[in-house]
Amino acid sequence: MSGCRVGTGFDAHRLVPGRKLMLAGVEVAHPRGLEGHSDGDCAIHALCDALLGAAGEGDMGRHFPSADPRWKDASGASFLERAARLVDARGFSVENVDVTVIAQEPALAPYIDKMRAALGRCLALETERVSVKAKSTDGLGATGRGEGIAAIATVLLSKRE
């Protein structure tokens, strides 16, 4: 059996007034933020699910249930750091991560380098092993209408000897 595992995660949240917009651990200037029990950072939530899934640890709902008041307004970074510790405890190392944020607005290109650095810090990874991309749906669907933001993440783990 190979010592490598791949995980995929997805998350989406509605944009609402009165909240900060957090994406990949970075505050993004926008009049609306993502709705959620925590900070709503769908990029980090997708990445956490990818990490946990690859390590055979389930998903965020198992480890950080929204019904648990401990996670009310928790930062995505705190979830990611905890997920990384679980992956490490299972004997895996993170080789690389790849996150795609799907949003019609705001333009995310000015934030990509900060997002890569923030995720790298949480995971103790060099920035060149962290990819963050931004895509739009060119007006199609809920993200295209500006109703929300979604993210997809993929990770590669290797088993330590």
Regions picked out by a protein language model, each given a short descriptive name:
Residues 126-129:
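Short acidic capping loops at alpha-helix termini that bridge into adjacent secondary structure
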Residues 2-114, 118, 123:
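RNase III-family endoribonuclease catalytic core
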Residues 132-136:
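Pyridoxal 5′-phosphate
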Residues 145-161:
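C-terminal edge-of-domain segments
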Residues 139-141:
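Mobile acidic interaction elements
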Residues 1-3, 160-161:
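SAM-dependent methyltransferases
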Residues 34, 143-144:
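Short Gly/Pro-enriched turn/cap motifs at secondary-structure boundaries
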